[in-house]
Amino acid sequence: MKTLVVKVGGSLLRSPVIISNIANILARLKPGKVIVPGGGIFADVVRKLFVEHKITSEEAHYMAIKAMEIHSVMLSYRLRTSKLCSTLEEIVSTLSEGKIAIVLPYEIIRKVNILPESWSITSDSIAVLIGILLGADLVVLLKNVDGVYVNGKVVKELKAGSVSKLKRYADDYVLELIRRFKVKVAIVNGLKPEILKYLVSGRECPQPYTLITA
């Protein structure tokens, strides 16, 4: 696997212990890792401003993306082998140096944005889009769930065309991006970051997760 994009959910970023565990796993993986953070509590502030100041959906969309960058900076302090990247060219250059690229997504999305500018779009779709732009082998969405549940069990693999909504697992536009660009997306429990080692190596993983493909 040459390029792995990992989106770290905002809820996971609240815990220093969880961040440390994820960082330790990522630091030990082979080169080619790109991290996209969630907006978390900072995106919640934008939601509040959206209501109180009556800003437009477009304005809120880009403000929320800018809010993600606060977590980017925070993560860069936790990963010494990382570098903050605000362009696709910087990401590629950082990966060629064997470092972890932590994305500052605002400028990238401003320049190449095919996403609807609304609250229906979250950092999930932004991470998947960045993965598409980089030609990533896999995009992993680290969440606080084991994967997508169907009839009470985590589904190992799911076709994007077989479902219309991802509900609480990810924003629904992720499905559209998977269908349109044939990108592979895995939903993984961020409390079990060791799963990443199996995904990168291609070995059978004993832990549950869901791989969504076109």
Please give the residue ranges for each predicted region.
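C-terminal catalytic "cap/lid" subdomain
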Residues: M1-A214
